[in-house]
């Protein structure tokens, strides 16, 4: 698999996630994959555009579903259009390098030389489940492996909404406390 700089990725891996959801557009399922699939990009947009709202929501939302819904509604209007129009994932070219390096240090064993990573995501629906297949360089998918809470060798794991919410909020809280 070629990378965005014209070379070949060192070690390509594929990670599959299955979200149990019969309603494609229900708030929790929709926002789960919204935050998950655009993890790095989304956090940067939030911190840049409305840090106060994010801080307030995160403060109370670990055990508060209502605040989680507020977060979902806020994200939906600003970002969902972009996500529905683009079937690939990539870092924003203008993502600040220090921000990028801090995140990589948490999830990766090495820091890539360039602050832009490209990988692809295929989404499909089977038997009332939303399935995501990510393919990219092993080191560039460490953050996804963390969310999945598994090793590279384990190719499939079913994730329930509640587990994903907690993991996402843990990551957002880590970033707020350590990077700002």
Curated annotation (Swiss-Prot):
This protein's superkingdom? Archaea
Query: Under which name does UniProt file this protein?
Result: Uncharacterized protein MJ0088
The organism named in the record is Methanocaldococcus jannaschii (strain ATCC 43067 / DSM 2661 / JAL-1 / JCM 10045 / NBRC 100440) (Methanococcus jannaschii)
């Amino acid at each position: 698999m070629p990378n965005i700089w014209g070379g070949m990725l060192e070690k390509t891996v594929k990670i599959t996630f299955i979200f149990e959801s019969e309603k494609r557009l229900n708030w929790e399922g929709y926002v789960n994959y919204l935050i998950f699939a655009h993890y790095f990009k989304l956090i940067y947009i939030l911190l840049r555009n409305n840090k106060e709202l994010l801080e307030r929501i995160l403060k109370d939302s670990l055990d508060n579903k209502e605040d989680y819904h507020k977060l979902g509604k806020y994200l939906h209007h600003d970002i969902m259009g972009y996500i529905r129009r683009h079937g690939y994932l990539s870092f924003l070219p203008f993502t600040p390098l220090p921000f990028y390096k801090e995140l990589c240090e948490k999830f990766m064993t090495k820091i890539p030389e360039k602050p832009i990573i490209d990988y692809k995501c295929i989404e499909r629906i089977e038997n009332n489940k939303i399935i995501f297949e990510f393919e990219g360089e092993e080191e560039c998918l460490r953050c996804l492996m963390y969310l999945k809470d598994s090793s590279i060798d384990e190719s499939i794991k079913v994730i329930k909404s509640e587990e994903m919410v907690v993991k996402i909020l843990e990551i957002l809280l880590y970033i707020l406390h350590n990077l700002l």
